[in-house]
């Protein structure tokens, strides 16, 4: 193959254009591949670590709110306020259940799935006890039942709440730690892929120079 400086001007321009186009195409393809890989991994990170952290956090807030509702229901002396709190409790409980169910689809490890199932098993008994306490303590006219409800709320429901809430924190921390690890890995992968793209450009340029001699 003739060198560029040995070709006629028309042929030289055509060959130079083709070489330049080849270099640009290789660089563009490499850049697209890098972007697709990084985009895919960040989407994965958001789905399984970023959004779940938000779902778990919001679920925990609603769980805490429902706990506060119960304490107020059995502790307040105004029946109208208690009736309003009963409605608020239902909203907070349903909101929690909805958020909590959304978390399940984002669990990817056996450990997090096991923790999630343990929490679910404990929640079944927790909600059952919670409903019993509310039923006993929601009427201000029944002082004896209210005292029993307050006793159960303090000595039975409170420890159950603390245990479940602690497990939720463990799940949240696990998600946070794994998300941080994935973020670090993505940053490293980004640097490697960018370096690879630059290397491709250098190699392509070297090839074009060789053809041009």
What do the predicted segments below correspond to?
Residues 77-85:
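Short secondary-structure transition hinges
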Residues 1-7:
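Short, Lys/Arg-rich, polar N-terminal cytosolic tail immediately upstream
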Residues 62, 66, 86-145, 160-163, ...:
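Heptad-repeat alpha-helical coiled-coil/4-helix-bundle sensor or tether segments in soluble regions
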Residues 16, 192-213:
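Cytosolic-side ends of inner-membrane transmembrane helices, especially those
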Residues 34-49, 67-74, 129-194:
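Juxtamembrane amphipathic/coiled-coil helical coupling segments that flank
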């Amino acid at each position: 193959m003739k060198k560029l400086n040995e070709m006629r001007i028309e042929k030289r321009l055509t060959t130079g254009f083709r070489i330049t186009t080849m270099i640009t195409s290789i660089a563009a393809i490499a850049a697209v591949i890098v972007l697709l890989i990084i985009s895919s991994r960040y989407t994965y990170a958001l789905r399984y670590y970023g959004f779940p952290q938000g779902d778990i956090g919001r679920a925990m807030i609603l769980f805490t709110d429902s706990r506060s509702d119960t304490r107020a229901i059995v502790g307040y002396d105004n029946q109208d306020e208690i009736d309003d709190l009963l409605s608020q409790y239902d909203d907070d409980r349903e909101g929690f259940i909805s958020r909590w169910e959304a978390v399940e689809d984002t669990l990817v490890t056996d450990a997090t799935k096991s923790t999630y199932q343990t929490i679910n098993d404990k929640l079944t008994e927790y909600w059952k006890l919670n409903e019993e306490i509310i039923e006993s303590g929601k009427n201000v006219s029944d002082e004896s039942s209210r005292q029993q409800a307050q006793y159960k709320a303090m000595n039975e429901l409170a420890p159950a709440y603390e245990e479940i809430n602690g497990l939720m924190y463990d799940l949240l921390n696990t998600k946070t730690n794994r998300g941080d690890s994935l973020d670090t890995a993505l940053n490293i992968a980004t640097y490697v892929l960018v370096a690879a793209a630059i290397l491709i450009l250098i190699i392509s340029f070297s090839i074009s120079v060789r053809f041009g001699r």
